[in-house]
UniProtKB/Swiss-Prot annotation:
Taxonomic source organism: Mycolicibacterium smegmatis (strain ATCC 700084 / mc(2)155) (Mycobacterium smegmatis)
PANTHER family to which the protein is assigned, alphabetical: SERYL-TRNA SYNTHETASE (PTHR11778)
Organism taxonomic ancestry: Bacteria, Bacillati, Actinomycetota, Actinomycetes, Mycobacteriales
This protein's name: Serine--tRNA ligase
Residues given in the record as L-serine binding sites: T226, S227, E228, E280, T379
Quaternary context: Homodimer. The tRNA molecule binds across the dimer.
Binding site for ATP: R257, R258, E259, V273, E344, L345, T346, S347
InterPro entries the UniProt entry points to: aa-tRNA-synt_IIb, aa-tRNA-synth_II, aa-tRNA-synth_II/BPL/LPL, Ser-tRNA-ligase_type_1, Ser-tRNA-synth_1_N, SerRS_1_N_sf, SerRS_core, tRNA-bd_arm
Record GO cellular component, one term: cytoplasm
Length: 417
């Protein structure tokens, strides 16, 4: 949720953010009205409760002649208090709904627009000239790394088996990511992949894209699309000690996405699938430290991309493609030879206080006063990276060179048919 002080003091900033995202700025006015109505309802209920309390005291001191009228007055006030509290509850509910409807306020400089309106910040490496490149699925099948046919037989479309060296390659990639994370002060976590609705809602994943999330209706639980979700809920309703600096966690988990809005997109191979594995960095920090932590997350992602030796670029994601929780997001996109374009491998988002406010995650400032923490997240490795590794390191004979950093995990320098 956004900061109400910002809303009240400078609603135009929030309206501008909504417009840049392609979202309705009228929601800002609806929230302002709901905020006013809520505060009015709270004040009315408080005043009536005070009046009721005073009337009750008068009853105890009243003479026999005065008592009947005062008792009637107390009874009337009790009914009014009951009605006022119901009105307050209704106003609170309307306010919460209006508050939850507004996305995080973007940072100044974030490009306006949608998916195609990003700004390229940096390009690293030169794509290698490959004559008649094979795509990752053709390579994966010929090398015995990927089995889409049996994945579909067992589970349906967009499912797959990673087999033999393919499984070793993914495990090696994820282990390398955990090594980078631990060396940089992250605590490694293997979190649950089923979460309660309040945690999924608190992280912002039950808004406009709720249809992307798998729900187990019988248990009212959700399968996570990223370990960002359980890691964000890890410190819900807590006051953290951040006096020694940010708390950094790296979550290794399977992830699940319905890809409901992706019909017809990336139907071949493992670029867009329903289940994959990922190591996700997640950080709790003071708001004033968040931008520096964001750059650090991006730096660790660059370190991982350098390790797999693929050309990539860094983009500043446009406001309409951020997701509701992020105030700024950087994507690292790797070159995919068969598509002659760059495809997303990592994202890192600065969610400022948006998620922590929803989940009531706080820290104590220098004066001991509780304040809302900031949260950030960023991919350190995921299954999709196999696409970039296989395609960029393919050889004319159909083999694939294993990046040096992954050789100890795969136990070979070349994957051969």
């Amino acid at each position: 949720m956004i900061d109400l002080r910002l809303l009240r003091e400078n609603p135009d900033i929030v309206r501008a953010s909504q417009r840049a995202r392609g979202e309705d700025p009228a929601l800002v006015d609806a929230l302002l009205a709901a905020d006013t109505a809520r505060r009015s309802a709270v004040s009315a209920a408080d005043n009536l409760r005070a009046e009721q309390k005073a009337a009750s005291k008068l009853v105890g001191k009243a003479s026999p002649d005065e008592r009947p009228a005062l008792l009637q007055r107390a009874k009337d006030l009790a009914e009014q208090v009951k009605a006022a509290e119901a009105a307050q509850a209704e106003a609170e509910q309307a306010f919460t709904a209006a508050h939850m409807a507004i996305s995080n306020v973007i940072f100044e400089g974030v490009p306006a627009g949608g998916e195609d309106d990003f700004v390229v910040l940096d390009t690293v490496g030169e794509p290698r000239a490959i004559e008649n490149p094979k795509d990752h699925l053709e390579l994966g099948e010929s090398l015995g790394l990927i089995d889409m046919e049996r994945g579909a037989k067992v589970s349906g479309s967009r499912f797959y088996f990673l087999t033999g060296a393919g499984a070793l390659l993914q495990l090696g990639l994820l282990q390398l990511a955990t090594q980078v994370a631990v060396q940089n002060g992250f605590t490694l976590m293997i979190p649950p992949v089923l979460v309660r609705p309040e945690v999924m809602r608190g992280t912002g994943f039950l808004g406009a894209h709720a249809d992307e999330v798998y729900r187990l209706e019988a248990d009212d639980m959700y399968l996570v699309g990223t370990s960002e979700v359980p890691l964000a809920g890890y410190h819900a309703d807590e006051i953290l000690d951040l006096s020694a600096g940010p708390r950094r966690y790296a979550g290794w988990s399977s992830c699940f996405r319905r890809e409901a809005g992706s019909y017809g997109k990336d139907t071949r191979g493992i670029i867009r699938v329903h289940q994959f594995d990922k190591v996700e960095g997640f950080i709790y920090c003071k708001p004033e430290d968040a931008e520096a932590e964001h750059q650090r997350l991006l730096g660790w992602q660059r370190e991982m991309l350098a390790a797999i030796e693929v050309p990539y670029r860094v983009i500043d994601v446009a406001a309409g493609d951020l997701g509701s929780s992020a105030a700024r997001k950087y994507d690292c996109e790797a070159w995919v030879p068969t598509q002659q374009t760059y495809r997303e491998l990592t994202s890192t988002s600065n969610c400022t206080t948006f998620q922590a406010r929803r989940l009531s995650t706080r820290y104590r400032d220098d004066n001991g006063k509780p304040q809302i923490a900031a949260t950030l997240n960023g991919t350190l490795a995921t299954t999709r990276w196999l696409v970039a590794i296989l395609e960029n390191h393919q050889q004319p004979d159909g083999s694939v060179r294993v990046p040096a950093a992954l050789v100890p995990y795969v136990r070979t320098e070349v994957l051969e048919p």
